[in-house]
Amino acid sequence: MTHSLASLKSSGPTGLMFHHFHGNGHLKSEGSFSADEFGRSLDHASRVANLLSADVFLEKALNQNLDEADICCSFDDGLQCQFDVAASVLTSKKLNAFFFVNTGPHAGHPYILEIFRIFRNQFFENKDVFFTEFDSCLETTMPEIFLSAKKTFPEDYLTVYPFYTRGDRWFRYLRDEILTPDEYLEIMKLIIQDHGTSIGEINKKITMSPESITQLAAQGHVVGLHSHSHPTNITRLTATEKHSEYSVNSEYLTGYLNSAPKCMSHPNGVYDEEILRVLREMNILVGFRDNMDSVSDRSNLEIRRLDSAFLPRD
């Protein structure tokens, strides 16, 4: 599948996927949008496809009448920068969007993946410097695991995402396929401590507050599930753990919204048939992936998305 803005004309119903924003107190990071850049990217998208508000897109999906060029705007990971920077742009364009929120940080369990991303951006000159330090720490702390991974790394790993460098793909291979969550956390804690900060300090700055989530819903945006703890690979969990990820996520959001969410996006785009079954049992009606790959017999829980990295900003 071609990854480009032009592909929206004929790729089938698609979500535009956004994560990070800078401005209004939030520092610039890799891939982040300013308010102006975000507005221009939506303008570009609306010229080549039919940009719908989330509630309209959702209704058309449920009625099975989405058009080939229908697109919508979506946000993952429940980040405060999305509320502080992007929400006002959406208001100015009279557009509402999907906001998919993982709720672990609200239960005292910080979203480690995003905290580590912010740490990399703020404490390292560039990601390659971080990758080098990560490799060095892993090789020193867990040498057998490191050497084994070097032998088994598939060169085509994640090449479906052309904006990933080889360093990106190697790091994600270590993180998502080789290390256990506890092993990855151990390595990252060592590196963070070496730089004089903590997970808790970073978490305070990035997590979208319950009040902001409630305000988004009041403004007409559609808030949905994104799992509770945002596992890097949710398919590695047991059946009970998979169900818990979404049921707990739903409990938190239902408390904020006074109604149960009916939509979701798959964390890291990862899911399996068991997860789809869990979502159907929870009456989740619409779900989004994180890529543009074709899926045979695609259900409404597997709608494709175009990463914001492919959207022009000028």
Could you tell me what each predicted segment is?
Residues L79-Q80, S229:
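Short, glycine/acidic-enriched loop or turn micro-motifs at the edges of active sites
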Residues L16-H22, G31, K93-V270, I303:
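Metal-dependent polysaccharide deacetylase catalytic core of the NodB/CE4 family, i.e.
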Residues M1-S74, C81, F116-F119, A218, ...:
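C-terminal active-site subregion of NodB/CE4 polysaccharide deacetylases
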Residues Q82-A86:
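Membrane-embedded segments
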